[in-house]
C-alpha cells in the first residue's frame, strides 16, 4: 500500500496521537468523500544533507527504532533456536511453578495453575504494565499473586512462560479456519473420483467490487501526497566516521521521522476505510494505536527485494540487515522483519489483496480498550468476505491461498510483541522518542 499525507510537513510536532483526529474543512474539489483529512502536525527537520528523491514505487517507512547509540555492528544475525517437544506427563500432585498452587498442566511452556495461565494470557494480550509498590521483590505464593501483579508477571517469565505461545481469540479462529481449509483440500485430493456437486465459489458483489476499487484508488491518491514529507526526513548519514555521535544521532532521527510519517499515513488511510469514521473516536484511536506497527510491517514486506535481501523505503536507497543493526535495532527484531518480508514476498500479493489485509488488521475487535467490539467484528467480517471472494477468483487453483494470507496476520501479532520489547529496550536506554511515537507505543517517561 502506499499510505499518504495531504499537506507538507509543518513546523510543529503533535503532542499526542489524538491530534491526528482533528479535522479541517473539506476541499470542495475532492471527489466522493475520499478526502484525506489529517491534522498534520509532526515536526520534520529540513534536511541539511543530500535530499533523497522519491518515486511512485517508493517504500513505506516502518517503525524501526534504534536501541542504543553505541550498539556495535553484529557479525552474526542468527536467532536462537528453541527446543520443541511434547510436554511431560503429569502425576497429579505437581505444583504451579509461579505461585505454588496445584498445577493443571503445562501452559505456555511452564507447569502452572489455571489462575497463572489466565493471568499471563490476559497480561500479554492487553500489553499490561504493572507497578510493584514494594521494590519488585515480593515473594510469590497463592496470597501474594493477588496483591502484586508486577512480581507475578515477572515470576511467570522467570519460570519460562513464553509470550509467543499466547494466542488471541482472533488467532485461534484463524488457526481453526486454516485447519478446516487444509482438511477440505486433503479430502478433495484423496478421493478425486468421488462424484460431488461442483463447489460454488464466492463471487464479488457490486458493493464489494466498488469497495476494493475505492481502497486501491485511495492508496494511489495518498501515495502521491506523501512524497514531500519523506523528502524532509533527516537523510541517512554519509560520514567518514559512521560510529561518531553525530552519525548515530542522525540515524536515530532518520528512522523515528520515517516512523512518524508512517503513522500519519496509516491514520490518513484508515479514515477512508468504509465504516471506520462511523466508530466512536475512542475506538478509532484504540484500533490504530495497536494496529499501527502491524500495518507498518505489512508495508515493509511490500518493499522487500529477495535478490539483494534488502528493503527499499526511499527511492534509490535500500536497507539490509546490517544497516538496521547500525541504526540500533536488536537482532531479535531485525531477523523476524526480514523473514516475514520474505514469506510475504513469496505470496506475490497485489495492491487489492494488500489493502484488504490491512483493513482486516485494523478492524480487530480484540484490541485493548475497544468498546464496541461487536460493530468492529461486523466491519472486519465485511473485509474478510471480500478478500475471500477476491482470492477465490484470482487464485482458483490454490484453495490454501486465503488461509495462508490470514495466517500472516497471526505472524504479525508475534512480530508486534517483539516490537514491544524493542520499544521497551529504548525506554531502558533512556532514548527519547518524539511525543507522537511515545503515545502510540505507550512509552511513558
Curated annotation (Swiss-Prot):
Residues 1-34, 63-86 are annotated as: Disordered. Nuclear receptor that exhibits a ligand-dependent transcriptional activation activity. Interaction with retinoic acid receptor (RXR) shifts RXR from its role as a silent DNA-binding partner to an active ligand-binding subunit in mediating retinoid responses through target genes defined by LXRES. LXRES are DR4-type response elements characterized by direct repeats of two similar hexanuclotide half-sites spaced by four nucleotides. Plays an important role in the regulation of cholesterol homeostasis, regulating cholesterol uptake through MYLIP-dependent ubiquitination of LDLR, VLDLR and LRP8. SUPFAM superfamilies: Glucocorticoid receptor-like (DNA-binding domain) (SSF57716), Nuclear receptor ligand-binding domain (SSF48508). Belongs to the nuclear hormone receptor family. NR1 subfamily. InterPro entries: Liver_X_rcpt, NHR-like_dom_sf, Nucl_hrmn_rcpt_lig-bd, Nuclear_hormone_rcpt_NR1, Nuclear_hrmn_rcpt, Znf_hrmn_rcpt, Znf_NHR/GATA. Residues 93-168 bind DNA. This is Oxysterols receptor LXR-alpha. The gene is Nr1h3. It comes from Mus musculus (Mouse). GO terms for molecular function: chromatin DNA binding; DNA-binding transcription activator activity, RNA polymerase II-specific; DNA-binding transcription factor activity; nuclear receptor activity; RNA polymerase II cis-regulatory region sequence-specific DNA binding; sterol response element binding; zinc ion binding.
